[in-house]
Amino acid sequence: DPNLDTTRHLLARCVAEGVAMVELCLPFRNAFTDGATLQHAHARALQQEASLQAVLQLVAEFSSRIKIILLADSSHTLRPLGIEQVLQQAAAAGVAGVLPHGLPPRLGESFQEAARQAGLPVVGTIYANATPETRRQVLGQTTAFLYLVSTYGRSGGAVEPSDLKCQIDALRAHTPCPIALGFGLRSPGDVGRAFDAGSDIAIVGSAVAGQVEAALKTGGCPIASAGDFIAALQKEAHDRRPA
């Protein structure tokens, strides 16, 4: 966002700042779980024709320097292009794991098998208000890390930290996988609070896209604006993340 060249520069900045992992999304229409900021980012990327092959080329360029998780939507990317084909191509490009967006847990077993065949770990997504059965399904299908959604609603909302530690502790008792906290982390302070709550990974998405959007609107440099913001996030992560 807004184009592949900007994304390339931002990936290079992530490498320079020591970011451990990046979630790279294949843009898609009707991103109903995303707030306005990420919906605008999807739209800008689609206008630049950010195809699967173009995104995977970026992955191939950077996969030896930083772990890249590929976020692919079930309805708009995986099923239309073919789950097995997408996963095999992603693995060949060097993707470190895959996050299937919009995939119901009841369909997760077949996806997990396809990912296993491709040699790709799967990121499981779980909401705080998930039913016990849904939790059981997601935990059983997760092989990379578990993405705990901090707030129910659309991405970019405020974090409610009051019971996050309890939720993370409860999940940790049932999975050996690292636990990531995301959906609503907007500042270095939020990143610090995520680690204070016991998460292993803090995910910031909308706020980074917001830096790009703000720079585009004001005639600034999105690479510098988003890059400096990433540096501030990474500094907080480095200072607060458990050793």
For the regions a protein language model found, what residue spans apply to each?
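Short beta-strand/loop segments at the ligand-binding rim of alpha/beta enzyme cores
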Residues: 63-73, 115-125, 171-184
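Conserved N-terminal beta1-alpha1 strand-loop-helix module at the mouth
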Residues: 1-65, 80, 143, 218-225
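Glycine/Thr-rich beta-alpha phosphate-binding loop at enzyme active sites
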Residues: 38, 135-173, 211-217
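Glycine-rich beta-to-alpha transition loops that act as phosphate-gripper elements at the mouths
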Residues: 1-3, 71-81, 104-105, 126-130, ...
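Catalytic cores of alpha/beta
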Residues: 3-16, 130-141, 181, 185-202
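Charged helix-capping and loop-helix junction motifs
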Residues: 81-88, 160-167, 222
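Alpha/beta catalytic cores of nucleotide-metabolism and tRNA/nucleoside-modifying enzymes
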Residues: 172-180, 186-243
